[in-house]
């Protein structure tokens, strides 16, 4: 719960099941695991061979709402590897993939990227509504106009980083989401996310856009189409175990390596419920997953799978950033779903 815990006591005979992630490996040496991944990548040449001296390299990182990824532990390794390939720090920049979220403070840049990286390379914030900072690169087959951050498009090579977990609309997080919505324009994001709605107004979410589902998922496929337009040269994504420790780091082709990581996620998170319960008490795992109610939606989604119809869900969310994102909070002013 936030940066701490909440304790509850329940009669043992009333507890149907305590659901945690399946047991999995824990990486003890994150630096060595990162080097192993980027030097023996999936579907790609090693990172040192993907870039060449003279390249301007942009690295996309997830924002503070995804700090569970622990980017600060593997990002310095990526930058050091680029140095070994002949790319100096002055030819590298980091772009924080806010999507529609607010900009970072300096302290949050340090928390996400590490103080070492914050002191070594330029860090920029993405603003989805800054039209002058965006470039149109095409329209997807589903009619989504792709506006992408100019800095990333101006880079010779783009590396995307992040973490993979279950996502209630896109099937899984990570991978292509670093580009869309990460560094996309607001118009692009709104059009893409609308694909998660059912065709009939008021019918709620599309059943094709659901946790763990990527085949036939229009939201996911639209994201992939936009990411392919940018065509990042490399990906590094983390997979975390139930305790929040690194279980695996995948690297390589922006789609193939990510897809391999989703299999690890299912091995850890694919826990079978014994039955549906009258009451489900759920936590997303504390900060930053409970930083606001919007991020908390991932808790409601998974908890709902274990809940009987008309049951009671108790979501444990600290929400220190309760007013973010503003567009989500503003939606509560409506008195109906139409």
Segments from the language model and where they lie:
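Short internal beta-strands
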Residues: 89-99, 237, 312-318
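Histidine-anchored nucleotide/phosphate-binding helix
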Residues: 68-87, 296-307
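Short glycine-rich or small-residue beta-strand-to-loop segments that form or flank ligand, phosphate
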Residues: 56-68, 93-100, 281-283
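N-terminal amphipathic/basic leader segments beginning at the initiator methionine
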Residues: 1-36
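C-terminal catalytic subdomain
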Residues: 290-338
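Membrane-embedded hairpin module used as a gating/binding unit in multi-pass transport
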Residues: 204-287
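An acidic, phosphate/nucleotide-engaging active-site surface
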Residues: 103-173
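Glycine-rich phosphate/diphosphate-binding loops that line cofactor/substrate pockets in enzymes
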Residues: 42-60, 86-89, 230, 271-277, ...
């Amino acid at each position: 719960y936030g940066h701490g815990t909440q304790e509850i006591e329940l009669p043992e005979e009333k507890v149907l099941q305590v659901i945690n992630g399946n047991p999995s490996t824990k990486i003890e040496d994150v630096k060595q695991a990162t080097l192993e991944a980027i030097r023996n990548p999936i579907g790609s040449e090693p990172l040192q061979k993907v870039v060449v001296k003279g390249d301007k390299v942009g690295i996309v990182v997830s924002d503070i709402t995804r700090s569970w990824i622990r980017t600060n532990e593997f990002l310095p390794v990526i930058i050091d590897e680029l140095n070994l390939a002949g790319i100096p720090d002055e030819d590298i920049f980091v772009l924080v993939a806010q999507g529609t979220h607010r900009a970072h403070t300096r302290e949050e840049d340090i928390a996400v990227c590490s103080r070492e990286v914050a002191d070594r390379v330029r860090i920029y914030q993405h603003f989805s509504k800054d039209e002058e900072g965006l470039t149109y690169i095409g329209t997807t087959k589903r009619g989504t106009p792709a506006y992408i951050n100019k800095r990333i498009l101006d880079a010779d090579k783009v590396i995307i980083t992040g973490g993979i977990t279950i996502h209630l609309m896109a099937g899984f997080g990570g991978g292509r989401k670093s580009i869309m919505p990460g560094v996309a324009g607001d118009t692009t994001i709104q059009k893409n996310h609308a694909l998660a709605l059912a065709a009939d107004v008021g019918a709620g979410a599309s059943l094709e856009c659901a946790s763990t589902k990527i085949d036939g998922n229009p939201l996911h496929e639209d994201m992939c189409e936009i990411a392919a337009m940018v065509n990042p040269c490399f990906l590094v994504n983390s997979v975390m175990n139930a305790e929040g420790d690194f279980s695996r780091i995948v690297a390589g082709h922006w789609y193939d390596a990510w897809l391999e990581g989703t299999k690890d996620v299912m091995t850890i998170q694919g826990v079978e419920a014994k039955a549906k319960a009258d009451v489900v008490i759920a936590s997303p795992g504390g900060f930053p997953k409970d930083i606001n109610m919007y991020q908390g939606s991932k808790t409601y989604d998974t908890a709902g799978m274990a809940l009987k119809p008309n049951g009671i869900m108790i979501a444990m969310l600290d929400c220190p950033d309760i007013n973010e994102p503003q567009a989500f909070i503003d939606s509560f002013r409506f008195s109906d779903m139409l």
